[in-house]
Amino acid sequence: MARIAGVDIPRDKRVVISLTYVFGIGRTTAQQVLKEAGVSEDTRVRDLTEDELGKIRDIIDKLKVEGDLRREVSLNIKRLIEIGSYRGIRHRRGLPVRGQNTKNNARTRKGPRRTVANKKK
């Protein structure tokens, strides 16, 4: 397995797919990186030379990926919470942030149902 940005990427997959194992690199970014490095997307990771791997590493080092990106995202959320914005309040309460309906759905964000017992009459 080759290590790129601290992540072991699978050897048997195509390079363009393997690069998406790095947090912050999707298909589009992977394609752009390979184009800049001059590597074919269809190449398998095991077939890459050390020189090609080095080029890919250098390009990815310029991008914000893995730990740096995770830290930035968490700091952005923390900042929203601290300034008391609507989005920050939604984050704090664990509710959907982008205006989705919460009457029926939003189970992923709210977690498992907590049923409330009825009052006795």
Curated annotation (Swiss-Prot):
SUPFAM superfamilies in the record: S13-like H2TH domain
Gene3D superfamilies from the UniProt entry: 1.10.8.50, 30s ribosomal protein s13, domain 2
This protein's GO CC annotations: cytosol; small ribosomal subunit
Alphabetized GO MF terms: rRNA binding; structural constituent of ribosome; tRNA binding
Source organism superkingdom: Bacteria
UniProt xrefs under PROSITE patterns: RIBOSOMAL_S13_1 (PS00646), RIBOSOMAL_S13_2 (PS50159)
Bias (Basic residues) ranges: 106-121
Assigned keywords, A-Z: Ribonucleoprotein, Ribosomal protein, RNA-binding, rRNA-binding, tRNA-binding
Gene Ontology biological-process annotations: translation
InterPro entries, per the entry: Rbsml_uS13_C, Ribosomal_uS13, Ribosomal_uS13-like_H2TH, Ribosomal_uS13_bac-type, Ribosomal_uS13_CS
Residue segments, region Disordered: 93-121
NCBIfam families assigned: uS13_bact
Family: Belongs to the universal ribosomal protein uS13 family.
Subunit description: Part of the 30S ribosomal subunit. Forms a loose heterodimer with protein S19. Forms two bridges to the 50S subunit in the 70S ribosome.
Task performed by this protein: Located at the top of the head of the 30S subunit, it contacts several helices of the 16S rRNA. In the 70S ribosome it contacts the 23S rRNA (bridge B1a) and protein L5 of the 50S subunit (bridge B1b), connecting the 2 subunits; these bridges are implicated in subunit movement. Contacts the tRNAs in the A and P-sites.
Annotated protein name in UniProt: Small ribosomal subunit protein uS13
Organism of origin: Bacillus pumilus (strain SAFR-032)
